[in-house]
């Protein structure tokens, strides 16, 4: 599924203040906006570094942690589920264009890492941000969302997803 860097665990960033790292972060933010994405991981631009950028686009707010629509940068992020509850989330990916699939994700996660200034950041999020963080950190671990799917019947083309991949239809068919 694409460039080999997407399937390889990314390397930790040692010097966040390195001009090359700062330039990479700027380029990632620009690429995320150009592609109208909610997040981007460095391996998606063929750089094996543990860096993600993400945001909550308008219309995707699900809970209070989603209210802040500013771009966030996490360097060397670590995620931990804050419980065992999961939910199916419909995901797409800039690295797998044209497809969408229902992926089980933890409903809430703790995160920690560093911002672009090198300051330690940590918190707990749910809703859309929890989903995006799990998706992007998976990229840093060499995991693409279809690899997390438990039922490959729940993946399809963007053009068909609206009609044939609705959660109410899927859950009804499984009952």
At which residue positions do the language-model features occur?
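Positively charged
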Residues: 1-175
